[in-house]
From Swiss-Prot:
Entry's Gene Ontology molecular function annotations: aminoacyl-tRNA deacylase activity; ATP binding; leucine-tRNA ligase activity
Membrane spanning residue stretches: none
Protein name per Swiss-Prot or TrEMBL: Leucine--tRNA ligase
EC class: ligase
Binding sites annotated in the UniProt record for ATP: K621
Gene3D superfamilies tied to this protein: 2.20.28.290, 3.10.20.590, HUPs, Isoleucyl-tRNA Synthetase, Domain 1, Valyl/Leucyl/Isoleucyl-tRNA synthetase, editing domain
Protein's UniProt keywords contain Ligase: yes
Record SUPFAM superfamilies: Anticodon-binding domain of a subclass of class I aminoacyl-tRNA synthetases, Nucleotidylyl transferase, ValRS/IleRS/LeuRS editing domain
């Protein structure tokens, strides 16, 4: 065995073995328990970053652990390879998105292999290939036939200069990123999938996701946003028109003093015909943001329409205002405003001098709305026949009255909107719909699928090549001329079903149900919590669509979800001659001084610039604080990088990148290597004989088996990989101090090392593979079994008891494991140190905590 640990040499050899033996390629096996481990697949941006490495190391640790449990483990990988970044890169590099994407895939694939991840590469998929998106197109046509797909107009960002649609990322400070023209909102026809048809099931089934983090489940519940309320009809004074409003607080109905409607509401547009100020306001709203996050923080503005609404119970007339905080595509596009009991309505009423009336008061205490609205539930007053009712009583009484008079109905609403899947981009899967010469819109016939996206294109940075090329859209359907849809799918479409395609990636159908139902659902899914409300919701939705199409027989796509934390690194900058910040990579910082608490007080880069240290923050290109994994692998080896990633932090928390920690991980592996090397060099022919062991040898063996038990629980149940590593490190300290003089000494070290390399195999597989062989095992470590705890080794012959006198530790005594209190007391009282502290005093009380503590109280 080589004395020195040489990571680059052993990692290349081990990776070649895995490749040549197709170690991680699996097929269905009804005789073995399956385990499907999946990490969210990467976008092929060009290079892996440390966030990828953390995600994929966690996944690989879980997969390798389960493999050694004897399970049939599937761990696939692929590429989420459509999307806007490829278009931008193609424009900048004067190429097309396809070659840029495929080149990146090859580079990143090599990086993944260098890190030693045990993927079944025979199942690799790239979502930008027709072999993949063909089935997505096919499934979309089936959803259309089931009535789950429809087309309607929706708002997009429009650049009037380039006459093109912009993604949100291409709008910078309200202007086009390319030509700096102010961006407008434009209504264009787009395709939607009815996720709202599954809202109730998506919400209810969250309760079945026992293996998902509570935070993710709460975020999804809030995103789906089920509410119970009343939809009521308000008349419009002086006309036969009416409009509907939904509220979850009908108890406040008697306090309505105005109604707010969206700028795009038909009533606002009607009133604007004779109101220039309103017309201008509507135009401004059209070109402003419509995201809920922005609405919450932006200035609330409005214009009176001159119209009045008729209160459905009192008949009182209240003014109708067009307001920028009401969205036409959310709810009914109108809200009843109760400034006495809603803070936003209160601030708007104060700003425009509108009436504020209180109709709810606290059960106890005084009502005060002089500075703010009273928004709590309470008791009604100033509400006529409803006075004195609490929230529930008022809700029911007012709802019943509105229903009885034909002016309202009880209703369950969801915050969730239907999924708009149209994108006016090029690099995406073409939407498989065609428009016939007579204007009829139908799905592309199955025998014409896939609708292939041309890859040999020129990007002008303005218009999608398939929109610019009028010939591409022309086709024939059933002998008739037709035009193809030139929008492409939202890339969340591809990532919503990729996990299922891995089960049968070569199948000449969307899924092979037999294979899919063997592997699905995913047993362990790993990815960032930032995907909680988009990808992870569409992922669940698509699984239900697949189930209802008869392709899978489970209700949910993944049993367990682990959301790993971000990777942070130090960030440094200096100000250049123009006062602009220049961010410097931590790898280029050559001098740092720290205070006694370890905080950086001074830093200088390799060019001599004195730097400002801004602390730890998420690795990013903008702050130039990303650490290239490849640089670290070349310097320390893949196993060291993997070990640091698992040891530095619990998986759900942020991980602070510290090269000193990486160096520590490297030293630990070298210690393990040396211990194994020293052991292998000796005569280890004597077999372990438990009956011959001394108490010291039994104690060391007990530590080995306690470590096996802890690591098994930490990785398998708790998923606390950092404490698993810490436990092995602690055991290593014991092993390094242990004598290797006798045959039984070495037999225990041998048992310990064969356990340790298997315990660490999921985390540092190259070293473990090599040491397993060096320790004389004839089978491959991948075909071995996870170490099993010898329960008899955990049984202690003796216990160490702490002896206290008046609350202070005065001695530690060793007693037989089965010693009773009288025996322990006798031994404790006979200890020299204890005798000294009891001299001249009277023992008043003795407390014994079995197996742990003897406490003597004396005065």
């Amino acid at each position: 065995m080589q004395e020195q640990y040489n990571p680059s040499e052993i990692e290349a050899l081990v990776q070649k073995h895995w490749h040549d033996n197709k170690t991680f390629e699996v097929t269905e096996d009804a005789n073995k328990e399956k385990f499907y481990c999946l990490s969210m697949f990467p976008y092929p941006s060009g290079r892996l970053h440390m966030g990828h490495v953390r995600n994929y190391t966690i996944g690989d640790v879980v997969a390798r652990f389960q493999r050694l449990q004897g399970k049939n483990v599937l761990q696939p990988i692929g590429w989420d390879s459509f999307g806007l970044p490829a278009e931008n890169a193609a424009i900048n590099n004067k190429t097309a998105p396809a070659p840029w994407t495929y080149q990146n895939i090859e580079y990143m694939k090599n990086q993944l292999k260098l890190l030693g991840f045990g993927y079944d590469w025979s199942r690799e998929i790239a979502t930008c290939t027709p072999e993949y998106y063909r089935w997505e197109q096919w499934f979309f046509t089936k959803l259309y036939e089931k009535g789950l797909v429809y087309k309607k107009t929706a708002s997009v960002n429009w650049c009037p200069n380039d006459e093109t649609v912009l993604a949100n990322e291409q709008v910078q400070d309200g202007c086009c990123w390319r030509c700096d023209t102010p961006v407008e909102q434009k209504e264009i026809p787009q395709w939607f999938i009815k996720i709202t048809a599954y809202a109730e099931e998506l919400l209810n089934d969250i309760d079945t996701l026992d293996g998902w983090p509570e935070q993710v489940k709460t975020m999804q519940r809030n995103w789906i946003g089920r509410s119970e309320g009343v939809e009521m009809t308000f008349g419009v004074a002086g006309s036969d028109k009416s409009f509907d409003i939904y509220t979850t607080r009908p108890d406040t109905l008697m306090g309505v003093t105005y109604v707010a409607i969206a700028a795009g509401h038909p009533l606002a547009e009607l009133a604007a015909q004779t109101n220039p100020e309103l017309a201008q306001f509507i135009e401004e709203c059209k070109n402003s943001t419509t995201s809920e996050a922005d609405l919450a923080t932006m200035e609330k503005r409005g214009v009176a329409t001159g119209l009045y609404a008729i209160h459905p119970i009192t008949g009182k007339q209240v003014p109708i205002w067009a307001a920028n905080f009401v969205l036409m595509n959310y709810g009914t596009g109108a809200v009843m405003s109760v400034p006495g009991h809603d803070q936003r309505d209160y601030e708007f009423a104060k700003k425009y001098n509108l009436s504020i009336e209180a109709v709810i008061k606290p059960v106890d205490g005084e009502l005060d709305i002089s500075e703010a609205a009273y928004t709590e539930k309470g008791v009604l007053f100033n509400s006529g026949e409803f006075d004195g009712l609490d929230f529930d009583g008022a809700f029911n009484a007012i709802a019943d009255k509105l229903v009885a008079e034909g002016k309202g109905k009880r209703q369950v609403n969801y915050r969730l909107r239907d999924w708009g899947v149209s994108r006016q981009r090029y690099w995406g899967a073409p939407i498989p719909m065609v428009t016939l010469a007579d204007g009829t819109v139908i799905p592309t016939p199955e025998d014409q699928l896939p609708v292939i996206l041309p890859e040999d294109v020129v990007m002008d940075g303005i218009q999608s090549p398939i929109k610019a090329d009028k010939e591409w859209a022309k086709t024939q359907v059933n002998g008739q001329d037709a035009l193809r849809e030139t929008d492409t799918f939202d890339t969340f479409m591809e990532s919503s079903w990729y996990y299922a395609r891995y089960c049968s990636p070569q199948a000449d159908q969307m899924l092979d149900p037999t294979k899919a139902n063997y592997w699905l659902p995913v047993d362990q899914y790993i990815g960032g919590i930032e995907h909680a409300c988009m990808h992870l919701l569409y992922f669940r939705f698509f699984h239900k669509l697949l189930r209802d199409a008869g392709l899978v027989n489970s209700n949910e796509p993944a049993k367990q979800l682990l959301t790993q934390g971000m990777v942070l690194a130090d960030a440094f900058y200096y100000n250049n001659d123009k006062g602009a910040r220049v961010w410097v990579s931590p790898l280029d910082v050559v001098t740092t001084e720290k205070d006694d608490k370890g905080r950086v007080t001074k830093a200088i880069d390799k060019d001599g610039n004195e730097l400002v240290y801004t602390g730890m923050c998420k690795m990013s290109k903008s702050k130039n604080n990303g650490i290239d994994p490849q640089v670290m692998v070349e310097k320390y080896g893949a196993d060291t990088v993997r070990l640091f990633m698992m040891f530095a932090s619990p998986p759900e928390l942020t991980l602070e990148w510290q090269e000193s920690g990486v160096e520590g991980a490297h030293r630990f592996i070298k210690r393990l290597w040396k211990l194994a090397s020293d052991y292998v060099a000796q005569d280890n022919s004597e077999a372990l004989d438990v009956s011959k062991l001394t108490s010291e040898q039994k104690a060391l063996r007990r530590e080995v088996h306690k470590t096996i038990a802890k690591v098994t629980d930490d990785i398998g149940r708790r998923q606390m990989f950092n404490t698993a590593v810490a436990a092995v490190m602690e055991l290593m300290n014991h092993l390094q101090k242990a004598p290797q003089t006798t045959g039984q000494d070495r037999a225990i070290i041998g048992e310990a090392l064969t356990a340790v390399v298997r315990l660490l195999y999921p985390i540092i597989p190259h070293v473990s593979f090599t040491l397993w062989n060096e320790l004389g095992n004839t089978n491959s470590i991948e075909d071995s079994q996870w170490p099993v705890v010898d329960e008899s080794a955990l049984v202690e012959d003796s216990k160490l008891i702490v002896v206290q006198v008046n609350g202070k530790v005065r001695a530690k005594i060793t007693v037989a494991a089965d010693a009773d209190q009288a025996s322990v007391e006798a031994l404790g009282m006979a200890d020299e140190q204890v005798i000294k502290y009891l001299d001249g005093v009277t023992v008043r009380k003795v407390i014994y905590v079995p197996g742990k503590l003897l406490s003597i109280v004396a005065n």
